[in-house]
């Protein structure tokens, strides 16, 4: 294991003892928020501390056992013992690298947030809108299966079903971390119901997954930088629909970003939702710029997450889904569309974590 990683582990070990002492402090016990934060950190550090202690003990055993190889009568037995110790040491090193990745300082801070999901129909006309509806159902069912709260922020229906565009909010602490790799272009291949010759048509949708940032962390938007338009809602809502201009359209003038919300009957609530989406988009755009400047690792492995990147193809006649970023194919399309999204999520997350482990083991840790 690299000296830089050992140094990092020793620093975390010292922090473990420090936090342990703090948790025994009566003043800390009176501060519930600080106690909660320290308890969470202690739980993370405990696993690292325990594993690192085990690694140190095995390393010491290797140092003690090694010189015994010089005894001809014990050589074979000692060599066998050393082989076992080195194998155990290698296993512990992999566990330590994984634990380091799970440490907050090495994770995307947005992973534990909720998220907004934007699905837009692309090329393919009515079929693209229908496919956008399929994707929305897929994400909705996944959220329901895992007891996440899902709220529709804005929806523009297609003329024959589905959606031209739909924006939803997933309220769960780990929603963004689970779904962030869904960003990009999704392509569908299937035979439309109106196709009399049985020909397969290709359509596409784009998906953007944006972290739901806490209000205090959102970028400040100057009133001079936005234009707010009101219009009558065109969605569901009974007699109230089209009687008042409760729907909101906000345009961010410096960037040209446009957000609409007509889900609520209250103009005030629609504006609040639209501003939340706009702020999250601006924050995501800033983060994307930083990622471009600082690192290309994620882009090289998993695509940039830009809407122009084709990340996945859904072939309905064959029941096949292919994730082009990692060359993963499954023939469980119907299950995925009905919400078993982990079939696709687990391989992509595992591939990403493997790449992080490689980068962590090859680079200096500060």
Curated annotation (Swiss-Prot):
InterPro entries: PCRF, Pep_chain_release_fac_I, Pep_chain_release_fac_I_sf, Prokaryotic/Mito_RF, RF-1. The modification N5-methylglutamine is found at residue 239. It is found in: Cytoplasm. Methylated by PrmC. Methylation increases the termination efficiency of RF1. Keywords: Cytoplasm, Methylation, Protein biosynthesis. Gene3D superfamilies: 3.30.160.20, 3.30.70.1660, 6.10.140.1950. It comes from the Bacteria. One of its GO terms (cellular component) is cytoplasm. GO terms for molecular function: translation release factor activity, codon specific. HAMAP family: Rel_fac_1 (MF_00093). Peptide chain release factor 1 directs the termination of translation in response to the peptide chain termination codons UAG and UAA. Belongs to the prokaryotic/mitochondrial release factor family. This is Peptide chain release factor 1. It comes from Baumannia cicadellinicola subsp. Homalodisca coagulata.
């Amino acid at each position: 294991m690299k000296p830089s990683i050992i140094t990092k582990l020793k620093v975390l070990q010292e922090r473990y003892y420090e936090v342990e002492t703090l948790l025994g402090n009566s003043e800390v016990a009176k501060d519930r928020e600080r106690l909660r934060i320290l308890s969470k950190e202690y739980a993370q550090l405990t696993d690292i501390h325990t594993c690192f202690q085990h690694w140190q003990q095995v390393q010491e055993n290797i140092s003690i056992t090694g010189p015994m190889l010089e005894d001809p009568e014990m050589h074979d037995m000692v060599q066998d013992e050393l082989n076992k110790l080195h194998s155990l040491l290698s296993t512990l090193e992999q566990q330590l690298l994984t634990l380091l990745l799970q440490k907050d300082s090495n994770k995307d801070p947005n992973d534990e947030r909720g998220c907004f999901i934007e699905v837009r129909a692309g090329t393919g006309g009515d079929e693209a809108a229908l496919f956008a509806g399929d994707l929305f159902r897929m994400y909705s069912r996944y959220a329901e299966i895992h007891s996440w709260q899902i709220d529709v922020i804005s929806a523009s229906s297609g003329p024959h079903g589905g959606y031209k565009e739909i924006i939803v909010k997933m309220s769960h602490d780990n929603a963004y971390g689970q779904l962030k790799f869904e960003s990009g272009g999704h392509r569908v291949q299937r035979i439309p119901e109106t196709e009399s010759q049985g020909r397969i048509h290709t359509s596409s949708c784009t998906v953007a997954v944006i972290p739901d940032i806490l209000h205090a962390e959102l970028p400040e938007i100057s009133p001079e930088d936005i234009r707010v338009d009101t219009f009558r809602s065109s969605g569901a809502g009974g007699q109230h629909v089209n009687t008042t201009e409760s729907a909101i359209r906000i345009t961010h003038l410096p960037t040209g970003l446009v957000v609409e919300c007509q889900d609520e009957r209250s103009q005030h609530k629609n504006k609040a939702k639209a501003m939340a989406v706009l702020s999250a988009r601006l924050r995501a755009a800033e983060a994307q710029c930083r990622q471009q400047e600082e690192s290309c690792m994620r882009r090289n492995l998993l695509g940039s997450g830009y809407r122009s990147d084709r990340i996945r193809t859904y072939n309905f006649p064959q029941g096949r889904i292919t994730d082009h970023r990692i060359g993963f194919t499954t023939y469980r399309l119907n299950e995925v569309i009905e919400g078993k999204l982990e079939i696709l999520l687990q391989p992509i997350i595992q591939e990403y974590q493997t790449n992080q482990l490689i980068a962590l083991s090859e680079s200096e840790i500060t």
